[in-house]
């Protein structure tokens, strides 16, 4: 007979947790020590709000007093540095500091580890006898960065680290001269992060770093640090702001001398640095990095002198363009990063420059030429210790194929008449007759006028309307219904071709297009054409603020936006911008300096690009633009050694220069092709293709030559050639065989998905065609 009710039969009675029924067979006797341990753990959880944290000591929390002590010791340790993110993630608790064995911050034996420093191999006896605080450890790049670095980037990081740490010689500076698109920014982010966190002595190598760049790239540097480090470090980006705010921020940065800073990296433009150099030069800085460092080729300008006053021995100079083959500029760049490597300017002139230049003279003796060669090799041997350069052919493994085309476009009858009338005028005759410095400046203005005319007559309409010298009768050449503010593509051969090609691209693909010109007036015409054809567009020139530039670029690169055209001034944004949202680029007019055009044309074929790229360089057939192209080709074909043997040191044009520049070949398909004296072509028709080992970096003579639209790699250009009837000749080549990108490994593809993303003037925001102070543009070469 049942004497008691089962728990489920006891209606209305709720069993409390302490009275919970336990079957006799399942009941276990707990040991006293286990009960005591559970009480301690329960008390600790209650005291710490159920946050279980490791404790540095053991204690019994069975009273209010000991619970209070437990709460103190279990409290998280807060780093007493504003904005500082510790390496361990901030999960440590308070307690007595424990003695630990020194070890590297990251595992040097881990997969894909990039080890920058290997300590001496100590024996056990040496370790026992050594002071533990003096044992050196490995310097290993943070895995978050080393896992995304490509082989050439790993090599670059190691090279820069060895240079700034004095491992490669008695110097602490270097020049990173990689071509555009090879990830110089990522390499510098890696170097900076490593030096700020590690050293062989288990402490930061540097406490602060300054990165100086063109104003348009300050925000880009901040984005790159955030992107690759995922918010682990805060940067002070100086863009905009009042003078008072800027002064206060820079003074706080300069006065912070702690080993670990909450904001250890200052991002600042060249112009701002020059204005506030008196603040930044007061205290020592661990390292300075100068982006677009070719701006420092003139040691006499104020920016160069201000940066030289910075108290730091670690100097890194970045330049995506080849170092100009001029000894004075070469000395300035090397002297900036390593002031004692080549001695003073007088020492350099005596030891190298005089001998090398003497050997270049036409009347030099064999002994002088031999000595010049010896000095050249000696100089190369010295500077190669601190310079690393790789070409963008490395990118062919990671990026889609790039097709580059030089399109020779015929002038329209209106352009042709105005052009020839100007060449026959007294204005040009006087320039040819008198070649002094004043006449050369006048010739520069005339050359700029002709370049603008090749773009569109609208660009020189004010001169025509005012009947300036050389344009007295040009008003009669314009059509009767001509309106200067209403763009008419039919008056310009290049605009006709552009109009046809944009229409074909818009109708047949979803490609986006970048339009680049040296003149804001040409950008104005681009805008008028875009509004006329109902194309969506954005524009970036020297008038746009830095903050707005970043928003415009992000908007254009967003694949979800229907922004068809990006109009860019090469002087204001030709360097550093990442425009991978587009895969077609028009270089509407050439620059005297080939490096400037190379910088501008590198905006789309960069890391993160997924589509084949098409680069179109438009030049007016037989005109001054072809003369400029010929000089570019000659400069690019020169051996990249110390000095350009044919470079003129004069600061003005010679009479032969002007005669060539002011000549015009009216009835040729391409004056450039004629001067190449191509042996692969017969009567302007290619009979033999270029060698298989050539690509778009080869000389123009090794490109494909087309006098008709057959064989073109781009169907859009082929259609426009037939429709516009204004193309006369095309040079074209590609970056690599189209099958190469398919050979990318899965690791490379994964790495490429993680990664995404240079004007030589003194002020990148100065949107004009010619800078008289830029000697690279004043010196011209024969073809």
Curated annotation (Swiss-Prot):
SMART domains: DEXDc, HELICc. Residues 2-9 are annotated as: Required for chromatin remodeling, strand pairing activities and coupling of ATPase activity. Belongs to the SNF2/RAD54 helicase family. A motif (DEGH box) lies at residues 291-294. Interacts (via N-terminus) with spn-A/Rad51. GO terms for biological process: cell division; chromatin remodeling; DNA synthesis involved in double-strand break repair via homologous recombination; double-strand break repair via homologous recombination; double-strand break repair via synthesis-dependent strand annealing; meiotic DNA repair synthesis; oocyte fate determination; oogenesis. GO terms for cellular component: nucleus. It is found in: Nucleus. ATP binds at residues 178-185. Involved in mitotic DNA repair and meiotic recombination. Functions in the recombinational DNA repair pathway. Essential for interhomolog gene conversion (GC), but may have a less important role in intersister GC than spn-A/Rad51. In the presence of DNA, spn-A/Rad51 enhances the ATPase activity of okr/Rad54. This is DNA repair and recombination protein RAD54-like. The gene is okr.
């Amino acid at each position: 007979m049942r004497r008691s009710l089962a728990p489920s039969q006891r209606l209305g009675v709720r069993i409390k947790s302490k009275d919970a029924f336990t079957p006799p067979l399942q009941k276990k006797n707990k040991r006293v020590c286990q009960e005591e341990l559970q009480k301690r753990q329960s008390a600790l959880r209650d005291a710490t709000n159920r946050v279980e944290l490791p404790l540095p000591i053991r204690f019994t929390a069975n009273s209010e007093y000991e619970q209070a002590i437990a709460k103190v010791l279990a409290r998280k340790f807060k780093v007493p540095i504003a904005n500082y993110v510790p390496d361990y993630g901030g999960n440590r608790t308070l307690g007595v500091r424990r003695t630990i064995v020194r070890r590297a911050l990251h595992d040097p034996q881990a997969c894909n580890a990039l080890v920058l420093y290997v300590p001496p191999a100590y024996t056990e006896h040496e370790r026992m006898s050594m002071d533990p605080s003096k044992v050196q450890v490995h310097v290993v790049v943070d895995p978050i960065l080393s896992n995304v670095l490509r082989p050439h980037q790993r090599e670059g990081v190691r090279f820069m680290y060895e240079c700034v740490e004095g491992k490669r010689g008695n110097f602490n500076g270097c020049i990173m001269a990689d071509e555009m698109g090879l990830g110089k920014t990522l390499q510098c982010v890696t170097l900076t992060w490593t030096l700020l966190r590690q050293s062989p002595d288990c402490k930061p190598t540097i406490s602060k770093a300054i990165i100086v760049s063109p104003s348009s790239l300050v925000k880009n540097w901040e984005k790159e640090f955030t992107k690759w480090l995922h918010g682990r470090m805060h940067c002070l980006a100086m863009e905009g702001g009042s003078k008072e705010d800027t002064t206060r921020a820079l003074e706080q940065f300069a006065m912070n001398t702690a080993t670990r800073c909450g904001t250890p990296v200052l991002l600042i433009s060249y112009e701002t640095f020059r204005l506030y150099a008196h603040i930044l030069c007061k205290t020592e800085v661990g390292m300075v990095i100068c982006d677009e460092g070719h701006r420092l080729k003139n040691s006499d300008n104020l920016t160069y002198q201000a940066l030289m006053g910075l108290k730091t021995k670690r100097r890194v100079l970045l330049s995506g363009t080849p170092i100009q083959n001029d000894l004075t500029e070469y000395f300035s760049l090397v002297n900036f990063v390593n002031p004692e490597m080549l001695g003073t300017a007088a020492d350099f002139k005596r030891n190298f420059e005089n001998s090398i230049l003497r050997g270049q003279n036409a009347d030099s003796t064999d002994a002088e030429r031999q000595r010049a060669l010896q000095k050249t090799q000696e100089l190369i041997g010295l500077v190669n210790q601190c310079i690393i350069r790789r070409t963008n052919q490395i990118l062919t493994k990671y990026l889609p194929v790039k097709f580059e085309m030089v399109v020779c476009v015929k002038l329209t009858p209106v352009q042709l008449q105005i052009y020839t009338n100007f060449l026959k005028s007294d204005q040009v005759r006087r320039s040819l007759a008198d070649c002094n410095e004043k006449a050369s400046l006048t010739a520069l203005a005339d050359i700029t006028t002709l370049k603008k005319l090749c773009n569109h007559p609208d660009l020189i309409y004010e001169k025509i309307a005012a009947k300036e010298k050389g344009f007295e009768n040009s008003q009669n050449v314009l059509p009767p219904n001509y309106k200067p503010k209403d763009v008419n593509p039919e008056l310009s051969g290049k605009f006709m071709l552009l109009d046809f090609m944009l229409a074909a691209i818009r109708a047949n693909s979803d490609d986006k297009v970048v339009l680049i010109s040296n003149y804001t007036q040409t950008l104005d015409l681009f805008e008028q054409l875009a509004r006329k054809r109902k194309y969506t567009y954005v524009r970036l020139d020297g008038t746009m603020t830095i903050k707005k530039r970043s928003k415009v670029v992000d908007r254009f690169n967003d694949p979800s936006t229907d922004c068809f055209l990006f109009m860019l001034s090469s002087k204001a944004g030709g360097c550093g911008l990442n425009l991978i949202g587009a895969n077609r680029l028009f270089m509407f007019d050439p620059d005297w300096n080939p490096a400037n055009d190379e910088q501008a044309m590198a905006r789309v074929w960069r890391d993160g690009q997924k589509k084949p790229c098409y680069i179109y360089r438009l030049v007016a057939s037989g005109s001054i633009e072809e003369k400029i192209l010929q000089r570019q080709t000659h400069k690019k074909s020169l051996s990249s050694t110390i000095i350009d043997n044919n470079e003129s040191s004069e600061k003005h044009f010679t009479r032969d220069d002007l005669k060539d520049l002011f000549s015009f070949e009216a009835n040729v398909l391409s004056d450039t092709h004629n001067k190449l004296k191509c042996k692969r072509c017969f009567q302007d028709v290619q009979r033999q293709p270029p060698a298989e080992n050539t690509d778009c970096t080869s000389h123009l003579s090794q490109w494909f030559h087309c006098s008709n639209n057959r064989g073109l790699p781009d169907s859009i250009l082929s259609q426009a050639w037939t429709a516009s009837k204004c193309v006369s000749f095309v040079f074209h080549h590609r970056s690599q065989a189209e099958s190469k990108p398919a050979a990318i490994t899965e690791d490379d593809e994964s790495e490429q998905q993680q990664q995404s993303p240079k004007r030589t003037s003194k002020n990148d925001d100065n949107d004009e065609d010619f800078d008289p102070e830029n000697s690279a543009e004043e010196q011209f070469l024969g073809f």
